Every structure is written in structure tokens, then in C-alpha cells.
């Protein structure tokens, strides 16, 4: 009986050690105190993605007080952008320190998206030792059609008022935020709203 208790106790201790070892580390996200809105946006999205993946995360303005064994992600913009492509970024990792250097604010966002995609795909923080990337196309975006598929009563071709009654989804702020976040996830930087021109109702031609 005593031996059985010892076995159970040993098993419990072993399980606790395994669970302790599997605990996900805290991730420090460091960015300049005077960071631009885009860098702040990048940091906030990275923080949320890490927390959704089970990591604890904190945003800091410097590395003071951070232990060398702690995971740290530094976000910064390049000071010398000569010869660098717009919206590009470089990711470099040395030990527990990963640095995302954007050629501009958008580059920092896309660099953070690269880290977010890595966490989602590989379920770890083993980021690339060195990675440089930049968009090939200047404009990348989605197109949203703002039109009806039928004539409105008493109106001609493409005649429809953009009111909450006619286009309720157009005034749904929460939905637009989700859509814009989707554009960011897909590295898009522009949004196109398309509508038909009511030419037929504006120009009257003789029979």
C-alpha cells in the first residue's frame, strides 16, 4: 500500500513538472515611447495575437529590467531608408531577442503580421534568424460594390440613396473594422468602393 502511494506521488510530481515546463513564456513587446500610430497598431495586434495563442504579453518602451532569458520582440523603423522598398521589413532573431525593423510604419505592421502568421502556423516563438521582404505591387486592395441588383421604385438605373435604410451594412462600423483588419492580414493597403454612374437619369436625349 505504501509503495502504491509512493508511485502515485511520484506520478503527480512528474505531471506537475511537465505542466510547469509546458507553461508558455511571457513575451515583451518593446517599441519607442514616441512610436507612430502604425507602429502602435502593429504592437497592439501582435499582443492580441500572442494572447489569443496562450502567451502572456506586455508592451514596454525600453528593455530596462527585462531579464536576458525573457522573450523580447522589438519594433522599430529604419533610420536610413535610402534604397529600401516602401512597406518592406526585416526580421532578425538573436537568442530570445527578435527585432522587427520596418522601412516605414506599414513595414512594421507587415513584419508583425509575419510573426503572427508564424505563431499561428508553427505554434511556437522560433522566429526566423533573418528575413527580409517587401511588397512587389504598390497598390493592393479589395473592391466593394455599392449598388442594388434591382431598380428602386420611381428611380432609374443606378439611382439609389446611400441611406441606412437602403444600405444598412454600409453604416455598420464593427463590420468595417473587421473588413479592414482582414485587408491588413492579407497585406493590402487600399480599399475601392465601386458604384455605377446614374448617367442615364442625368442626361435627357431627344427621341
Give the label of every model feature segment.
Residues 1-25:
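Bacterial Sec-dependent N-terminal signal peptides
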Residues 3, 52, 56, 118-121:
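A structural signal for alpha-helix termini and helix-coil/disorder junctions
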Residues 12, 40-41, 109:
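A broad detector of short, well-ordered amphipathic alpha-helices
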Residues 15-17, 22, 72, 112, ...:
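Generic recognition of cysteine residues
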Residues 34, 45, 49, 81-82, ...:
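Feature activates predominantly on carbohydrate-active enzymes
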Residues 8, 22-95, 126-129:
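Acidic, contiguous N-terminal accessory segments
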